[in-house]
Amino acid sequence: MPKRTFTKEDIRKFAEEENVRYLRLQFTDILGTIKNVEVPVSQLEKVLDNEMMFDGSSIEGFVRIEESDMYLHPDLDTWVIFPWTAGQGKVARLICDVYKTDGTPFEGDPRANLKRVLKEMEDLGFTDFNLGPEPEFFLFKLDEKGEPTLELNDDGGYFDLAPTDLGENCRRDIVLELEDMGFDIEASHHEVAPGQHEIDFKYADAVTACDNIQTFKLVVKTIARKHNLHATFMPKPLFGVNGSGMHFNVSLFKGKENAFFDPNTEMGLTETAYQFTAGVLKNARGFTAVCNPLVNSYKRLVPGYEAPCYIAWSGKNRSPLIRVPSSRGLSTRIEVRSVDPAANPYMALAAILEAGLDGIKNKLKVPEPVNQNIYEMNREEREAVGIQDLPSTLYTALKAMRENEVIKKALGNHIYNQFINSKSIEWDYYRTQVSEWERDQYMKQY
């Protein structure tokens, strides 16, 4: 949704005119999970005065119990009424930044951390970092108890229409709800895998775009349930089909000028664009754990399913990590194709931006573009042209993250350490599990 500017008086007026009954104060933890404190509208003045307190020790990756008091400072520009609550007492949403009791931003708040990295970008002379995401998701049927099953709601394919695309009605209702909330929807279609869908919305500045991603996920899950469906942003819920990605289309601006566009060069790209790309490539292994944060994420990053496994770039080829779409002028952008929808968008974007700024500050040279299908190249051919692999497991991604100072800087000490600790526990828990596949393979043979 486009950036808006609201005052306290605007919020009071909206709440009264729309007969809002409840306020949902939302924020995001380091795992990308939406958290909220819901209060009756009678608490509006307390909310507007930044006096809403919550227990930070109850939130994954925040603080210890002895330093748990946190305050929610609402971003008034994020005010929106959830359309589906109109019949049962309207609920309005405000996205909040998390503050400590001394009045300073909490260093463990991913949204506040992204703002910190954006300030570093501004110090280099850039004014905006824009993001256009492409989130994908699956729709599964619910059982009679309302629990998700593994039964897909259709067997459609890429760009299919009804009757093959049985998710069309659900997807249309999602789009209508998003538009009612101010989203500018650009495309909505069935994706490659059965039961898989994509809805694209217009790019926005970094913080607004990440807010939009979190709002989008909430709306998709809410409306899907009304259709007796479960929407999941799990990267690879099924074996043998494409997983769900969330490509990040990013661009830097200086005022009204796209800092990536130069009409006088062969590819229409500036030196800044090449340096930014070089920085992303250099730090790609280090930010993979952030952009692909689940054990399951690495089931998607395998050859043969249009997801990148290799660190390279191209102007047209979709097999490398980075693609530069053909649009130029103000639409010039770099597409980072590895990100999946389980990622915390604030953290993923902070990591990608810091990686790109590393390239700009150090004037890194971008390697030659790779225009052949990397999936068809063997290891010797890839090594001959300097193509590295992305990490293939959460374990190797965390190892690469520990070795990368740029990504540590991007996240700050608190988020960096808490994230690595949480994900290391997740990996240890996963590696000790015994799967159905293992029993099928080995029980009888051994």
UniProtKB/Swiss-Prot annotation:
Places the protein is found: Cytoplasm
Catalytic activity: L-glutamate + NH4(+) + ATP = L-glutamine + ADP + phosphate + H(+)
Site location (Important for inhibition by glutamine): R64
GO BP term, example: glutamine biosynthetic process
Activity regulation statement: Inhibited by glutamine.
Coiled-coil positions: none
Keywords of this entry: ATP-binding, Cytoplasm, Ligase, Magnesium, Metal-binding, Nucleotide-binding
Residues reported to bind Mg(2+) 2: E136, E191, E198
UniProt xrefs under PANTHER family: GAMMA-GLUTAMYLPUTRESCINE SYNTHETASE, TYPE-1 GLUTAMINE SYNTHETASE 2
Protein name: Glutamine synthetase
Binding site for Mg(2+) 1: E134, H247, E335
Higher taxonomy: Bacteria, Bacillati, Bacillota, Bacilli, Bacillales
Residues binding L-glutamate: N242, G243, R300, E306, R318, R337
Native organism: Staphylococcus aureus (strain Mu50 / ATCC 700699)
Lipid metabolism listed as a keyword: no
